[in-house]
C-alpha cells in the first residue's frame, strides 16, 4: 500500500535529520538513539534482522510514528511510502484508478485531473511496465504485478521522499531489476530514497547502508558495511559464513529468527 503525506511546514527541504531518535513499542526500544541524516539526491538501504527497527524507522521518516524522545527536522514537504501491506479496499479498482489516486489533492476533484496529472500517471506506468494493465482490476493481478503498480503509484505522486519497505521481496528478477532501476533514477533526480531490505545485493544499489539492530550498528558505503564482521554484530551467527551464499557473485545470505534463509 502507498501512503502519501503532504506537509510543508516551512522547514529546510534539503534533507531529513534524526537526532537521538528513540521509539518505545510494547515496553521495548524499537529504535534506540538513532542519529543520522538523509540528504536530497541520495539512496539509503536499511538492513538488519527481523525486529531490528527497519519498518519503524521508515514510519518515523514518513511521519506516521512520533519518536518517544529525540527529534526529526528538515522534513521534505511530500513523502510517498510503499508499505508491505496491500490495501484490500483497493482490490476492486482498476490499475488506472489506483495510479490516478496519487494525483488527487484536497482542492482537486478526481475528475478534474489535468494534463500534467495524466502525463505523470502514464510515465510512471511505463517505467514500471504496467501500462498494458491500466484497465485491469487490481484483484486480477499477481503479487508481483500489484507491487509494481504500487511503486508506480508512488512515482506518479512525484514526492520528494520515496520510502520503500522491502520492495522486491517475492518478485521475479525482471521486476526486481525494474524497481531497482527506478530507485536509482529517482535518486539521480534529486529525491531522497530510503528502503528496507533483506537482499544484500539490493542494498549494494544504494549509496549508503545503515545496519540496524534497534540501535545503529554501522553506517557507510556498501563496500564498507556489507562485510561479515559488521553484519555479524547485528545478526550474530545468523550470517552463514563469509561466503555461504552468492547472489551475482557477492551477496551474503541472511537468515531470519527461525533459521530460514532470507534471499
Regions found by a protein language model. Give the residues of each.
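The feature captures the beta-strand-to-loop junction immediately N-terminal to the Walker
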Residues: 47-49
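Helix-to-loop junction immediately C-terminal to a conserved catalytic motif
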Residues: 62
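Conserved ABC ATPase "signature" region
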Residues: 115-133
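Conserved ABC ATPase signature
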Residues: 137-141
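Catalytic Walker B motif of ABC-type/P-loop ATPase nucleotide-binding domains
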Residues: 162-166
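Conserved switch/coupling elements of ABC/ABC-like ATPase nucleotide-binding domains
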Residues: 214-224
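ABC ATPase nucleotide-binding domains
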Residues: 224-263
Amino acid at each position: 500500500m502507498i501512503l502519501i503525506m503532504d506537509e510543508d511546514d516551512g522547514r529546510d527541504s534539503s534533507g531529513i535529520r534524526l537526532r537521538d531518535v528513540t521509539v518505545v513499542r510494547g515496553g521495548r526500544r524499537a529504535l534506540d538513539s538513532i542519529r543520522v541524516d538523509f540528504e536530497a539526491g541520495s539512496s539509503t538501504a536499511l538492513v538488519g534482522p527481523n525486529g531490528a527497527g527497519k519498518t519503524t524507522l521508515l514510519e518515523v521518516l514518513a511521519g506516521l510514528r512520533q519518536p518517544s524522545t529525540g527529534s526529526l527536522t528538515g522534513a521534505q514537504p511530500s513523502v510517498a511510502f510503499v508499505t508491505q501491506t496491500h490495501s484490500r479496499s483497493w482490490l476492486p479498482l482498476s490499475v488506472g484508478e489506483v495510479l490516478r489516486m496519487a494525483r488527487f489533492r484536497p482542492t482537486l476533484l478526481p475528475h478534474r485531473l489535468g494534463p500534467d496529472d495524466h502525463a505523470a500517471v502514464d510515465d510512471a506506468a511505463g517505467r514500471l511496465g504496467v501500462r498494458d494493465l491500466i484497465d485491469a482490476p487490481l484483484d486480477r493481478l499477481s503479487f508481483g504485478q500489484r507491487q509494481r503498480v504500487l511503486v508506480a503509484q508512488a512515482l506518479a505522486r512525484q514526492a520528494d521522499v520515496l520510502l520503500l519497505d522491502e520492495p522486491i521481496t517475492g518478485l521475479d528478477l525482471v521486476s526486481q531489476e525494474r524497481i531497482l532501476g527506478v530507485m536509482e533514477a529517482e535518486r539521480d533526480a534529486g529525491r531522497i530514497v530510503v528502503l528496507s531490505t533483506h537482499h544484500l545485493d539490493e542494498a549494494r544499489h544504494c549509496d549508503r547502508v545503515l545496519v540496524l539492530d534497534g540501535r545503529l550498528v554501522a553506517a557507510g558505503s556498501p563496500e564498507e558495511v556489507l562485510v561479515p564482521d559488521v553484519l555479524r554484530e547485528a545478526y550474530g551467527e545468523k550470517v552463514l559464513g563469509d561466503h555461504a551464499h552468492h547472489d551475482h557473485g557477492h551477496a551474503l545470505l541472511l537468515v531470519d529468527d527461525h533459521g530460514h534463509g532470507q534471499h
